[in-house]
C-alpha cells in the first residue's frame, strides 16, 4: 500500500516510521574509509580506494596509496596545459577517475606513509590556500607582459608544489624493499591499462568513444558510450565478481541525504491526481520539499528512469560532474527495493560509518561515468564496445 504525502508516494513502511532497513546482498572486500576533508579531491580519494580494492580482489595485500602524490602531479600537468591554452581550460582541483590511472602510468605511485603530501601544517587536506595560490600563479604567468614565457616558470610551479605537498622521493623503502615510484606501481598485482571508463548519453553514438563534455575532464579523456541498461549490467557484473566500481555521479539531487546516508529519486505524483495536496506541495520552498523527502522514514516509490531522462538531466545541467565514490556492493531495503552500497570519502561517520546506500534508480539517473576492469565486462557487451 502507499499514501500520498505532499506529492510524494510513500510506502506503508514509511508511514509507520520504521526507517530504512538495508540488507547487504553482495559486498566486495573494502579498504578503510578515507577523508578528503576540505578539498575537492573526491576523484582521487575514491579512485585510489577503488584501485586498492582491486589489489585486494587480485589477491594482493591491503595498502593505502598516497592521494597527494596523485593530486600534486595532476596539478602540475593541469598547469602546463592551462598555460599552453592561454587559460582556456578549467583550472581547479576537480578531476576524474582517469586522472589517477594516467598519473600512475606517468609518474608511478607511492604508499601514503612515504608521501603524505601534508606539508603545510595540517594532518588532513585543506586546499583553500593551495587552490588560490596555484590559480594565481598560472594566471600571472599567462598575463605576463614580456611577450614570451620565461625559462623559470616551470621551476617556480614545482617550487610551489614542493612547498605545499613535499619534495618527491626518487627512491624509498617499503616493507624492507627498495622501490622507485615507477617500480612500486609495477609491483602491484593490477595494471592501469586494464581500466576503462564508460558513460551513457545519446548526443554521441553508442558503441563509440567520445570526450565527455564536463569541466573537470581537463585531460579530454575519451570514454566508451553504451546504453544505460548495459552500463548497469556492467556494474552488476563487477560486484558479482567481487570487484568494485569507481563511480562519477551528482549528489546535488534532492533525494540525497547526507545525514541519513541514503539517496533516492522519489516519484512525485502529478498535480491533477492529488487535489489540494498538490496545491500545498507547489507552495513549498525547495528547502521545505527537501525536508519532507528527508523525513520520509522508509521505502518510497521511485521514478522509472529512462535513457531520455538521463540525457535531459545532463543537457540541462541537472546532472554534472559533482562527486566521485566507489560502488562496493548490492543491497535491498525492507520492501525489497534494490540499492547499491557505496563507499564515500567524507570520513567514517554517519549511520553506516562512511558508507551510503543509493537506490538503483538514483544510479541509473545520476551516473556520469564509471571506471571498471575491462576484463569483467560481459562478453556480449565487450564485443559491441570493440574491446
Q: Where are each of the predicted segments found?
A:
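Compositionally biased, low-hydrophobicity segments enriched in charged and small polar residues
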Residues: 16, 72, 295-299
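Bacterial Sec-dependent N-terminal signal peptides
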Residues: 1-17
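Active-site nucleophile-adjacent alpha helix/oxyanion-hole segment immediately C-terminal to the catalytic cysteine
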Residues: 17-246, 350-352
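Active-site signature of cysteine proteases
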Residues: 155-387
Amino acid at each position: 500500500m502507499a499514501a500520498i504525502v505532499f506529492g510524494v508516494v510513500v510506502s506503508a513502511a514509511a508511514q509507520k516510521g520504521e526507517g530504512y532497513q538495508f540488507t547487504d546482498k553482495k559486498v566486495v572486500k573494502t579498504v578503510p574509509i578515507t577523508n578528503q576533508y576540505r578539498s575537492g579531491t573526491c576523484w582521487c580519494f575514491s579512485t585510489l580506494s577503488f584501485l586498492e580494492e582491486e589489489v585486494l580482489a587480485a589477491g594482493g595485500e591491503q595498502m593505502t596509496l598516497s592521494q597527494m602524490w596523485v593530486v600534486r602531479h595532476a596539478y602540475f600537468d593541469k598547469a602546463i596545459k592551462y598555460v599552453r591554452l592561454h587559460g582556456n581550460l578549467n583550472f581547479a582541483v576537480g578531476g576524474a577517475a582517469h586522472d589517477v590511472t594516467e598519473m600512475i602510468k606517468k609518474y608511478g605511485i607511492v604508499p601514503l606513509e612515504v608521501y603524505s603530501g601534508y606539508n603545510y601544517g595540517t594532518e588532513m587536506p585543506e586546499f583553500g590556500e593551495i587552490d588560490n595560490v596555484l590559480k594565481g600563479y598560472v594566471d600571472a604567468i599567462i598575463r605576463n607582459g614580456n611577450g614570451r614565457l620565461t625559462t623559470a616558470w616551470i621551476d617556480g610551479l614545482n617550487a610551489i608544489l614542493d612547498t605545499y605537498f613535499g619534495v618527491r622521493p626518487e627512491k624509498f623503502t617499503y616493507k624492507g624493499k627498495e622501490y622507485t615510484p615507477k617500480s612500486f606501481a609495477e609491483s602491484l598485482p593490477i595494471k592501469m591499462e586494464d581500466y576503462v571508463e564508460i558513460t551513457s548519453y545519446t548526443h554521441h553514438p553508442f558503441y563509440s568513444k567520445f570526450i565527455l563534455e564536463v569541466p573537470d575532464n581537463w585531460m579530454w579523456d575519451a570514454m566508451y558510450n553504451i546504453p544505460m541498461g548495459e552500463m548497469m549490467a556492467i556494474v552488476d557484473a563487477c560486484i558479482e565478481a567481487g570487484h568494485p566500481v569507481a563511480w562519477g555521479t551528482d549528489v546535488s539531487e534532492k533525494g540525497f541525504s547526507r545525514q541519513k546516508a541514503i539517496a533516492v529519486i522519489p516519484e512525485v505524483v502529478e498535480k491533477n491526481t492529488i487535489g489540494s495536496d498538490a496545491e500545498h506541495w507547489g507552495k513549498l520552498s525547495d528547502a521545505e520539499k527537501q525536508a519532507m523527502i528527508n523525513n520520509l522514514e522508509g521505502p518510497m516509490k521511485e521514478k522509472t528512469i529512462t535513457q531520455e531522462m538521463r540525457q535531459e538531466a545532463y543537457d540541462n545541467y541537472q546532472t554534472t560532474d559533482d562527486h566521485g565514490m566507489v560502488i562496493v556492493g548490492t543491497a535491498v531495503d525492507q520492501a525489497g527495493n534494490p540499492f547499491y552500497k557505496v563507499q564515500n570519502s567524507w570520513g567514517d561517520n554517519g549511520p553506516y560509518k562512511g558508507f551510503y546506500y543509493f537506490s538503483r534508480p538514483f544510479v541509473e539517473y545520476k551516473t556520469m561515468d564509471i571506471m571498471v576492469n575491462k576484463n569483467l565486462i560481459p562478453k556480449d557487451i565487450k564485443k559491441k564496445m570493440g574491446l
